[in-house]
UniProtKB/Swiss-Prot annotation:
Organism encoding this protein: Vibrio atlanticus (strain LGP32)
GO cellular component, one term: cytosol
Catalytic reaction annotation: 4-phospho-D-erythronate + NAD(+) = (R)-3-hydroxy-2-oxo-4-phosphooxybutanoate + NADH + H(+)
Record's keyword annotation contains Iron-sulfur: no
Pathway involvement of the protein, from the record: Cofactor biosynthesis; pyridoxine 5'-phosphate biosynthesis; pyridoxine 5'-phosphate from D-erythrose 4-phosphate: step 2/5
Protein name (database record): Erythronate-4-phosphate dehydrogenase
Binding site residues for substrate: S45, T67, Y259
Residues reported to bind NAD(+): Q127, V128, D147, T176, D233, G258
Function: Catalyzes the oxidation of erythronate-4-phosphate to 3-hydroxy-2-oxo-4-phosphonooxybutanoate.
Single GO term (MF): NAD binding
GO annotation terms (biological process): pyridoxine biosynthetic process
Similarity-based family: Belongs to the D-isomer specific 2-hydroxyacid dehydrogenase family. PdxB subfamily.
Active site: residue positions: R209, E238, H255
Main location: cytoplasm
Length: 377
């Protein structure tokens, strides 16, 4: 049995080699010839699975993407060809949410505002958007939600019309898939008209899909230099980036918002377990068994936490400025976008750290943000 796997999928080689002959390759450069005689394909979002890619896939029966998003796979084609397809919904929701929160916290320091006095508008309320909303509300930050598809499906949460959310939010963070058809397409959802209507004191964060934001229109909006702030983890034509846009962004990174070690381990184990089920084997893998101990596994609070404490705690675990600096320093080198993704550091989630403290420390909200908490007597 031959299994072809994206080389940027941690733990995959060791796990899948238990099931067959494994080949690791760059997911972005896969060709039809690579899939000849391949039984199973394990990918991430950079691989577009379409008619061209699988035109020579004479034995392909299983495709798994170790990502929550599925818009890079032609699912109708999978059905037509009798190829079983699976994804890893929610695997990276924590990492993406913590990326967005890190950007908010650092900007709060730089621009001199309190995150607790801001309203955060979340566009797209699937796994990531819903998790981010839960975290923010858990620590007392006001949230507005927009997701017309969820609303149509009967989701009982309180949703806000898009125009109202754009007007009333101080921070706008995007967590939609990319769609070009249907009643609510997201391609260029944030277009020239939307951008020109945003206030100078608003912040836009895109850690979803690059084409959700019209990058040329965003560049023009930022060139007004009126204080409007944007953070991009994704680009419209990645891995190509607009070098005129980069210096205008507060923070920018090469599509790594969801690249936390826990998220990648979850994605790998989820599709490994799906493949085991597909094969009818009883083997299973668990992300928690694969993860190393965090560099700072425990911290003790000696008083009630405040916003300064929150800044320190979250930045100790993940500070978006680290990835921003690495990206800006290396992006001019050809191939650096994918190289940084491939060599990404072992970033951890808040849950890797156990916080202890007595009742006066008020640890419960921090648990809602994702930290492991252990009250002491």
């Amino acid at each position: 049995m031959k299994i072809l796997i994206d080389e940027n999928m941690p733990y995959a080689e060791a796990l899948f080699s238990q099931l067959g002959e494994v080949t690791m390759k760059s997911g972005r450069t896969l060709t039809a010839d690579d899939l000849v005689d391949v039984d199973a394909l394990m990918i991430r979002s950079v691989t577009k699975v379409n008619e061209s890619l699988i035109s020579k896939a004479n034995k392909l029966k299983f495709v798994g993407t170790a990502t929550a998003g599925m818009d890079h796979v032609d699912q109708e084609l999978m059905k037509e060809r009798g190829i079983f397809f699976t994804a890893a919904p929610g695997c990276n929701k924590v990492g993406v949410a913590e990326y967005a929160f890190s950007a908010m916290m650092v900007l709060a320091q730089q621009q001199g505002f309190s995150v607790f006095e801001k309203t955060v508008g979340i566009i797209g309320c699937g796994q990531v958007g819903s998790y981010l909303a839960k975290c923010l509300e858990g620590i007392g930050i006001k949230v507005l939600l927009n997701d017309p598809l969820k609303q149509q499906e009967g989701d009982t949460r309180e949703f806000t019309e898009l125009d109202t959310l754009l007007e009333q939010s101080d921070v706008i963070t995007l967590h939609t898939p990319i769609t070009k058809t249907g009643e609510f397409p997201t391609h260029h959802l944030i277009n020239e008209q939307v951008l020109n209507n945003l206030r100078a004191d608003q912040i836009l964060i895109n850690a979803a899909r690059g084409p959700v934001v019209d990058n040329q229109a965003l560049k023009a909006r930022l060139q007004k230099a009126d204080g409007f702030t944007a953070v991009l983890d994704v680009f419209e034509f990645e891995p190509e980036v607009d070098f005129e846009l980069l210096p205008l962004l507060a923070f920018t990174t090469p599509h790594v918002a969801g690249y936390g070690l826990e998220g990648k381990a979850r994605g790998t184990t989820m599709i490994f377990n799906s493949y085991c089920e597909f094969l009818g084997t009883e083997q299973r893998a668990y992300a928690s068994d694969l993860l190393p101990t965090a560099p700072v596994p425990k911290m003790k609070l000696d008083r009630a936490w405040d916003e300064a404490t929150l800044h320190n705690l979250t930045q100790l675990i993940y500070d978006v400025r680290k990835d921003d600096a690495l990206f800006r320093r290396n992006i001019s080198t050809p191939g650096s976008f994918d190289k940084m993704r491939k060599e990404y550091w072992d970033r951890r989630e808040y849950s890797a750290v156990e916080l202890t403290g007595d009742e006066s420390c008020n640890l419960t909200p921090l648990s809602k943000l994702g930290f492991m908490v252990k009250p002491t007597l």
